[in-house]
Design a protein with these regions (language model features):
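FIC/Doc superfamily catalytic core
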Residues: 1-208
């Protein structure tokens, strides 16, 4: 079992002041200056960033490094169906850019559940899927059900919207890790490709 000792840290500041941005991309949006309410949550090393294009570039670099770390971990399903692991993955993906990386959302948004319910539903989600994985043989999982497990986990994880941002990208990566843990593809050659591997433009892939 992988050791998730790279524990996430809480963020500073008032999260209620964050202006959530969508996981989508456009040229007009990219050139928009980062608003002060968002800028305050950049890590000290990123305070020099000015536009969302700058942020997108740094996030892409951070995610690439996070993927490299994830590939080396060899996660099991028990590892992945664990809230600490999921928070650690999010922190690895965004922690070099944002102070809120890996921290559970504490404000209400138009997307996702009420923040007061996140911890409970987050834990219920991983317990449910951990049970499914442990009892797959007894339940009689078909090959199709095995191939859909990662996608189903992705769907329910996105619905909770546990983090301030990056939920879609995080859930897609976790879905690939779930498939990989079952011997169905890998991060390098995923069972269900997202983004460029799926044939979609980058702008559309970030909406998935």
């Amino acid at each position: 079992m992988v050791q998730t000792h790279h524990i996430v840290s809480g963020h500073s500041g008032n999260e209620s002041d964050i202006t959530l941005r969508p996981d989508t991309f456009s040229a007009a949006y990219a050139s928009t200056p980062i608003e002060p309410d968002d800028h305050q949550f950049l890590v000290p090393e990123m305070k020099h960033l000015i536009t969302w294009a700058d942020v997108d570039a740094e996030e892409a670099s951070n995610i690439a490094k996070g993927r490299a770390w994830l590939i080396a971990q060899h996660f099991t399903l028990d590892d992945l169906f664990d809230t600490l692991t999921l928070r650690t993955i999010h922190q690895r993906m965004f922690g070099k850019v944002w102070t809120w990386a890996g921290s559970v959302r504490r404000r209400e948004t138009s997307i996702g559940i009420d923040p007061s319910q996140i911890q409970t539903q987050f834990e219920q989600l991983v317990q449910n899927f951990r049970w499914r994985a442990a009892n797959a043989d007894e339940i009689g999982f078909s090959e199709e059900e095995r191939r859909e497990l990662g996608i189903r986990f992705h769907t329910e994880l996105v619905a909770i919207h546990a983090f301030v941002n990056g939920n879609g990208r995080h859930a897609r990566l976790v879905a690939n890790l779930v498939d990989s843990a079952m011997g169905l593809g890998s991060l390098a050659d995923p069972l269900y490709p997202w983004g460029a591997r799926s044939g979609l433009p980058s702008a559309e892939s970030r909406k998935l």
